[in-house]
Amino acid sequence: MSNYQQESSYQYSDRSNNGQQQEQQEKKEVEHSSYTHTDVKVNMPNLIAPFISSSAGLAQELVGEGFQASVSRITGASGELTVIDTEAETEEARRDMEAKAREQELLSRQFEKELERKTEAYRKQQEVETEKIRKELEKQHLRDVEFRKELMEQTIENQKRQIDLEARYAKKELERERNKVKRVLERSKFHTDIQVNMEAAAGSTHSGSSSVAVSESEKFQTNN
């Protein structure tokens, strides 16, 4: 365990209210270190020096047994000092602020230009895409019109075929009905017999007729 004490010296200068005299006085302090000063002694606290020991490994191979290392901590204290910027530092700070403002304005203009460029490029691309979509929609509309036209024509053609089909089969059905009627009429004209019998107190009367059709002529025979 070891004790360490450090003495710190602080130099305070007398300054007048006049700024010019104060600046000259500071320059003298820089040139003469023995100007009016005050020594302040501060007792440092007792600190335990760190103790690092190693009995094996790389340290042992390098320095052998009993390798020890010690580290001491040194601390110091400072008093409050008044910091005054010089004219050169003030001018430099002003130039830095102006340069910063110019760079910020330049960055803003560059950002706005880049944003405008990208926006214009996007707008043109959208116009091209929109034009493509419009033309494609026009083509699609024409295709729809053609499709509906073809669909209507096909529908009308199908209805005509349906009507023709119905008419054809209706004609055949009428032909069959005509043949049936014709056969019935021919059969009834071919042989027709009429018999009439009347009974009375005075006697009876019998009457009969027979009709036979040959072509369009008819032969009638009557018996009383």
From Swiss-Prot:
UniProt-annotated stretches for the region Disordered: 1-38, 200-224
Protein induction: Expression is highly induced during desiccation.
Compositional bias of kind Basic and acidic residues: 24-38
Residue ranges, annotated region (CAHS motif 2): 159-177
Compositional bias ranges of the Low complexity kind: 1-13, 200-215
Taxonomic superkingdom: Eukaryota
Transmembrane feature ranges: none
Any one GO CC term of the record: cytoplasm
Coiled coil start-end: 83-191
Primary localisation category: cytoplasm
Record localization: Cytoplasm
Phenotypic consequence of gene deletion: Affects slightly survival under dry conditions but does not affect survival under frozen conditions.
Something else known: Trehalose, a disaccharide essential for several organisms to survive drying, is detected at low levels or not at all in some tardigrade species, indicating that tardigrades possess potentially novel mechanisms for surviving desiccation involving tardigrade-specific intrinsically disordered proteins (TDPs).
Domain remark text: CAHS proteins contain 2 repeats of 19-mer peptides designated as CAHS-motifs that comprise each two octapeptides connected by a tripeptide.
Function: CAHS proteins are cytosolic heat soluble proteins that seem to contribute to the anhydrobiosis in tardigrades, but their specific mechanisms are yet to be identified. It is possible that protection during anhydrobiosis might occur via the stabilization of vitrifying small molecules such as sugars, but not via the direct glass transition of CAHS proteins themselves.
Family: Belongs to the Cytosolic-abundant heat soluble protein (CAHS) family.
Name of the featured protein: Cytosolic-abundant heat soluble protein 77580
Annotated organism of origin: Hypsibius exemplaris
